[in-house]
Amino acid sequence: MKLKLGLAALLGATVLFARDIIVPASELPRNAQDFISKNFKTAQIALVKKDIDSYDVTLNDGTEIDFIITGEWKDVDGKYKALPNSILPNIMPKISASLNAQIIEVSREINGYKFELSNQLKIYTDAQGNILGQKF
């Protein structure tokens, strides 16, 4: 009986602490706030959700940005709108121009980046922007 009660309490605590909580934008780490203000000058922060290891930010233009808990971005999704090249200024303009498409999502990968383009193509690069692969 005590074992069942203990397991139920553990399960309840896990469910309780695993949920995202809504926090004010001021709770974002400074580097996350700077990233947003530098790259999305006309957009405002509409919603910030925090969980145990990340922040999920939604801007008023629909853009979604995921940050790790330290404030470093891990994914930027423009929701089918072109992302600003200022996110990765040495890489993004080169990819957009060479493939004649707009970048609508960018994610950090282990050794580089994954870009999703407006023509549904996915491009994988190393940290310097050298294309490693692509897929539809």
What are these regions (language model features)?
Residues K2-G6, F17-F136:
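Long, terminal "pre-/pro-" and other extracytoplasmic accessory regions
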